[in-house]
């Protein structure tokens, strides 16, 4: 997503945007959401929710994203891996780890 894309989302009345690299496998050479975030937050922060998706593996990554202007983070793959490896207990453990790190 570019700054212009984010501005357009605000113009058409979107309530949120998601910065994602689609698991880093869809577009060869795509920019990291963390790299895009500061410029996009400067351009549209406060006008639209900014959800960072991609590269979030630890609680410290959540703190970094929030400090750069995100209003939320997505952590889907982490929960799926935890569920597959450890079932409900695995998900509970990863939630505890994330909370402890934050």
What would you call each of these model-derived segments?
Residues 1-52, 59-82, 96:
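Alpha/beta enzyme core
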Residues 71, 87-102:
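Internal helix-turn-beta structural module
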